[in-house]
């Protein structure tokens, strides 16, 4: 499915967990269905909870077959079902043509950082182009080791500190910052970290109930899908 998350055998398929979609490739069956990066989760079938199969191997058994896949949307806080055809793995995004991370889709509503102010002439303003009030930081990937740091974790507060440390450790290197914007949707921002000894992103962030992932009505969602088809 794009990274190793769907292949790991130590995933215990838990209630409220699914594969968060971080990137959808052009070959993905989800591309024209209106499935969205960062806000949508692929929900594994319940039958896997009593099976030794990983989600990846379950999909491989369904190659060229039509299957029903449930998607949980953070935007509507609801589950939807799509019929897709499982394609051969072409090594770009795997069988489903997307990169994913195994996460709790309920805690994802609040485990993120809302950008509430940006310092003038800061790295956040001049290099990352963050937008106050509109942007929510979801995670970070170091392109040096390929590791994804999602803020949606049981150790959320500890990871906020580690998040800053990851930025500092990658001085002079490239990282991908995963950001959700309330008007534009998902943004993957490629940034090259400066070599400054003291680095600061230069923005103030907040989290908690009043800063949770923004919601949209189902009517808004339907209008967006209609626009994709037209």
Predicted features along the sequence, with ranges:
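Intrinsically disordered, Ser/Thr/Pro/Gly-rich linkers and terminal tails that flank
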Residues: 1-230
